[in-house]
Amino acid sequence: MILFRIRLLLYPSTLLLILLSACHQSSQTQSQQSSEKPPASAANPASGPAPSTSNTVAEASRPSGPIRFTDVTAQAGIHFRHNSGAFGKKYLPETMGSGVCAIDYDNDGWQDIFFVNSKNWPGHGDTKPYSALYHNNQDGTFTDVTKQAGLATEMYGLGCAVGDYDNDGHDDIYVTALDGNHLFRNLGNGKFADVTARAGVRDPGFATGAIWFDYDNDGKLDLYVSHYVDWSVATDQTCSLDTKNKSYCTPELYKGQSGTLFHNKGNGGFEDVTKKAGLYDPTGKSLGIALIDVDNDGWMDLFVTNDTQANKLYRNNHNGTFTEMALEAGVAYSDAGKKRAGMGTDAEDYDSTGRQSLVIGNFTNESLSLYHNDGSGLFSDNSVASGIASSSASSLTFSAFFFDYDLDGLPDIFAANGHVADDVSVVQPTIHYAEPPLLFHNKGHGKFDDVTDRVGTALRQPVVGRGAAYLDFDNDGDLDLVLTTSNGPAKLLRNENGNQNDMLRIKTIGTRSNRDGIGAKITVTTREGLHLFKMVKSGSSYLSQSELPVTFGLGKPRANKVVSLDIIWPSGKKESIRNVQPNQFLTLEEGKGILSQHPIDLNGAKHSETK
């Protein structure tokens, strides 16, 4: 029987053991934005109402009072429960949990939710758990439409990624799994078809995270899938915390697996170009993936976290290949030069430098990592200086991402926590299996404040947190949270009063670029001095994906506030739009500027948006 070293307790993620981001009537664009409205069609019923010329949100209608997150799971009608299949054998995959993805699958302008589920082990359990798609009813409730949508497929699911890989105007879903991945094509009629075999993306192995991105800027979304370790029931190791009972083992006892890069051929099929692209790495034990443009050259790079192995940063060489540069960039190891148990990750410009920095969830006693992008391809670990290290030191963080919960223009940080060992307290009485999430408020100047205990009681509840994402499910302008728990119920947390500041929500539609506009860079500037930058992105977090629309917090309401938008599309096309009123949902189409716009009702009024 293999015994754990206490040192191992500081590790892994799936591991075991132990301590484990209106136009004014005369809006203009530098790209000679068309003055004609696009024609109506099935995919574009209308181009939207006439542009606003004033801030349509009345001050009297603005919420007031402290911001808080409220658990509305039950009243929203969400009954999803993750099933790990655990029956006492302590198999490694049982520690992983599963992801959650925000998706507007029917293009009604309301974010729906897709939860990934696992399954029972052969010979154990009579039920057949499925992943679940919940349709947004536009009244604060959801309906489970999994079976009618054609998504009731049994698998040991882990993660998900959302993207329109065939550019037909309907977002598709890719699900990673222990026993072969699945690509579900959105048919546009409320149903999905499993096209895995035809597309050639089954990718057998221990797949974890996934991300859609156009690495060669050809207008079609490619797919990167991270892999964990070489594990099977037959090769499962035996470990113990108390020398008597079996515990979950560390990933250090297993060989790694390389991730996979699939190139979109444009005919519904994909080609495995991992080795050709320079991404083959059989030592990797990868969990999280972040889309990042390290050097702002317009070509998408990849950051991949590894569990008990060095993280990887792949710079795009513009010729279909990548160069690994994590060590020279300063993001491979901790400041002390040690490998950490990297899990969920995200990239965002949190301090208005115009450069994306990185946040990473790590194991117990490792704290969150915050790598600041200093420019010139170099990063510095600011976790201690920023104030997030001390509060997160005892947590085992799976999901970690930036989002502006109070819309002040400064991205905050959310972390979903939960240990991997249900018996961890045997060796560390102060460490618990269930842990409360963490919320860090961005104070500006690179500093954060732990406000978990100041935003209501929902975030104080200990859970075995795993996947997490943000979305504005009630269309009131602020960002809500959804998270999964390992072998437990999902949580939907509504942001109450988070929309007291101005905001602008933007959806992108590519024409020369990929349809979702993933990789598009948007800069918002106000007369008051705010200069904000965000990128449309897939993936991030842990096994999960937040909504594709981008939300800019614009700070305190001011009369006659207008903003300017500058967007660089993945194709390289640049557009500028001036005199835009805040508190709107804009749809921007590449080459045409504002396709449609709707005022945001701060009470969550109904408005629809077309893809």
What kind of region is each of these model predictions?
Residues F69-V72, T141-L151, K191-V201, G268-Y280, ...:
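Blade-edge beta-strand/turn elements of extracellular beta-propeller
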Residues I78-G99, T127, A149-A161, G200-I211, ...:
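Repeat-based blade/solenoid architectures
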Residues G97-N107, H135, Y156-H170, L183-R185, ...:
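Beta-propeller blade termini
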Residues N55, G65, A86, I388-S390, ...:
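Gly/Ser/Thr/Pro-enriched helix-cap/hinge segments flanking short amphipathic alpha-helices
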Residues S131-N136, Q257-N264, R315, Y371-N373, ...:
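Beta-propeller blade signature
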Residues V116-K128, H227-Y254, A415-H432:
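Short, conserved, GDST-rich strand-edge loop motifs in beta-rich repeat architectures
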Residues C23-S26:
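Bacterial signal peptide processing site
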Residues W110-N117, D168-A177, L223-H227, D301-N306, ...:
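Hydrophobic beta-strand segments that make up the repeating blades of beta-propeller
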